[in-house]
A protein has these predicted regions:
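N-terminal export/assembly segments and adjacent metallocofactor-ligating motifs
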Residues: 1-302, 307, 313
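Non-catalytic alpha/beta scaffold blocks inside enzyme catalytic domains
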Residues: 192-193, 197-198, 204-461
C-alpha cells in the first residue's frame, strides 16, 4: 500500500532533527500517562459535555393551558376555520392580511384578496408575523429597574412627572418612535404637541433611505411599465412594497404574451431577488454606480469598463424607446445626487404620473430638531429629563459611533415600551409590554396610501 503526500508540522520534523522526537514525547508527559483513551471514547465524553452544556442553557417555561372558549358560541362548528381581515406592520406601513382562525386562535396569515393594491399578495414577513404572537419570550408584565411591577405602580410614578410637564409645557420630555403611518397615532402626536408645546417627538428609522422621513415618496407602478432600469433597487426584495411589486411583476410575466412582458435591466452591487429575474444583469461596485447613471442620462464623459458601457447604452436605448412607459429606479441607500438624477430622467421621459408617482410622505414627519441625532445632542447637553421609547431598540440599532446605552444613562426617567425585554429595556427605568398587532385595534396606511383598519383576532395573550 502506497501512501499519499506526507505532511510535516514544523521545520524540525521535515529535517528529521534528533531532538524533535524527544520533544514530542516529553512535551505533555503527564497528560499522555493519565489520559489513555481512544478516539471513540474521546468523542463520547465530548458529546456528553456538549449535551450538559446545552441543558444548562435551558430554562423552564410557564405551563399554560390554551383554552379555545370559555363560553362556546352557539354557531360554532368544531373544526371550522374562520377568516378575519386585518393587517400587520412592516416599516410602519400596513400589510393587509386575511387571518385564518381555528377555535378562536389565529394559525395562519395570507394576503387579503380584497385589498385593491395587494390583491392577495403575500410575503414571508407577512406570514411570519404570527410567530411574534406566540413567542414565549414576549414581555408579560411591567418592569421597574428590571423587577416585576404593576401598572398601578407605573401610574403613580407618572403622576409625579405629569404635574411637572403640565407646568413647564413638556420641557425636557422626549418621545422616540419608529416609522408609523397610523392616522390615529399621528393625530395623538398632534394633540400631544398642542398640549405640551415644549415636548419633542423624535423619529428613529435606521433603515431610512435618501431624504429619510422628509423626502417626497417615490412610488413605482410596475404594472404600467414596459421597460424598467434598476440601479441597485431590489424591487422584488424585502420592503413594504414587496407584495405589490411582486403581484405586478407576476401579471406582466405570467400568461402575458412575450411582446407585452416587462423588460428589466438591473445593475446591482450585491445579488438580489430582482437581479435574478432581470433580462440583463450587471454586477458593479457601489463606487461606480453614479458614473453608470450619468452614462444612462448622457451627462458628460465618464470612464466605464466595456461591460458597463455596453449595459449603459442598452439601458439608455430601452428607456428612450419606451417614453411614458419606462421607469428608472434607484436603491433607497443611494446618495441624494443619484436619486435626483433618476427623477430627472423619469421627468424627461414623461414617466412621472404614468409608471411612477411623487407624493407627500404618508408617515410621521418630524419637525426641526426632532431627528435621532438631535435627540442624542440634547441628551448630552442635559436638556432631556424624561425619554419614552415606543417600540424601537436604539441601543442595539443605533449607528456604531453612537453609544446610546451610555448616552441615555444621563436621562433621569427612561421608559421603554415594546414586545420584548431587549437591550433598550435593559437600560431603562421602566419597561412596559405592548400588544402585538393581531391583538389590538389600530390603523395604518398601506404603501399605496389607502387607510387600513387593524382589528384584533384574539385577546391579548
Amino acid at each position: 500500500m502506497t501512501g499519499g503526500k506526507k505532511f510535516w508540522r514544523s521545520i524540525e520534523e521535515y529535517q528529521r532533527s534528533d531532538g524533535f522526537g524527544e520533544m514530542l514525547k516529553s512535551e505533555f508527559p503527564s497528560i499522555f500517562e493519565l489520559w489513555k483513551v481512544d478516539r471513540r471514547e474521546l468523542l463520547r465524553v465530548m458529546g456528553a459535555s456538549l449535551a450538559l452544556a446545552g441543558m444548562t442553557g435551558c430554562k423552564p417555561t410557564r405551563s399554560d393551558e390554551a383554552v379555545p372558549f370559555v363560553n362556546r358560541p352557539e354557531s360554532y362548528i368544531k373544526g371550522r376555520t374562520d377568516h378575519y381581515a386585518t393587517a400587520v406592520l412592516f416599516d410602519g406601513f400596513a400589510q393587509p392580511v386575511l387571518a385564518t382562525c381555528v377555535a378562536g386562535r389565529p394559525i395562519k396569515l395570507d394576503g387579503n384578496p380584497e385589498h385593491p393594491a395587494f390583491r392577495g399578495g403575500s410575503t414571508p414577513f407577512m406570514q411570519a408575523a404570527i410567530l411574534d404572537l406566540y413567542d414565549p419570550d414576549r414581555s408579560q408584565e411591567p418592569l421597574a429597574g428590571g423587577n416585576p411591577a404593576s401598572w398601578a405602580d407605573f401610574d403613580g410614578e407618572m403622576a409625579k412627572w405629569r404635574s411637572e410637564w403640565q407646568r413647564s409645557g413638556g420641557a425636557g420630555l422626549r418621545l422616540l418612535i419608529g416609522p408609523t403611518t397610523s392616522p390615529t397615532m399621528l393625530r395623538q402626536i398632534a394633540e400631544l404637541r398642542s398640549a405640551l408645546p415644549h415636548a419633542r417627538v423624535h423619529l428613529f428609522d435606521p433603515l431610512s433611505g435618501y431624504g429619510g422621513e422628509t423626502q417626497q415618496q417615490f412610488r413605482p407602478k410596475l404594472e404600467a411599465a414596459q421597460v424598467v432600469v434598476s440601479l441597485d433597487d431590489d424591487l422584488l426584495g424585502p420592503g413594504a412594497m414587496q407584495a405589490i411589486n411582486a403581484r405586478a411583476w407576476g401579471d406582466r410575466h405570467g400568461d402575458a404574451p412575450r411582446e407585452q412582458r416587462m423588460r428589466l435591466l438591473m445593475a446591482e452591487t450585491t445579488p438580489t431577488q430582482t437581479g435574478a429575474k432581470a433580462d440583463r444583469r450587471l454586477g458593479i461596485p457601489p463606487s461606480r454606480l453614479a458614473m453608470l447613471a450619468q452614462a444612462i442620462a448622457g451627462g458628460g464623459e465618464v470612464t466605464l469598463t466595456e461591460a458597463e458601457l455596453g449595459w449603459a447604452k442598452e439601458a439608455r436605448k430601452a428607456l428612450q424607446g419606451a417614453r411614458g412607459r419606462s421607469l428608472m429606479t434607484v436603491g433607497r441607500f443611494a446618495p441624494p445626487q443619484l436619486h435626483a438624477l433618476a427623477l430627472q430622467v423619469n421627468q424627461m421621459l414623461g414617466n412621472v404620473g404614468h409608471t411612477c408617482e411623487i407624493a407627500a410622505p404618508l408617515g410621521f414627519v418630524p419637525g426641526p430638531g426632532e431627528s435621532f441625532l438631535d435627540l442624542v445632542r440634547d441628551i448630552e447637553a442635559r436638556r432631556v429629563s424624561a425619554l419614552f421609547v415606543l417600540a424601537p431598540n436604539p441601543v442595539y440599532q443605533a449607528p456604531g459611533d453612537v453609544p446610546f446605552a451610555e448616552i441615555c444613562a444621563k436621562v433621569p426617567l427612561r421608559v421603554h415600551a415594546g414586545l420584548h425585554v431587549d437591550e433598550t429595556a435593559a437600560v431603562s427605568n421602566w419597561h412596559l409590554p405592548i400588544s402585538q398587532s393581531l391583538e389590538d385595534w389600530s390603523d395604518a396606511r398601506s404603501p399605496d396610501g389607502l387607510a387600513t383598519i387593524i382589528q384584533p383576532v384574539v385577546r391579548p395573550m
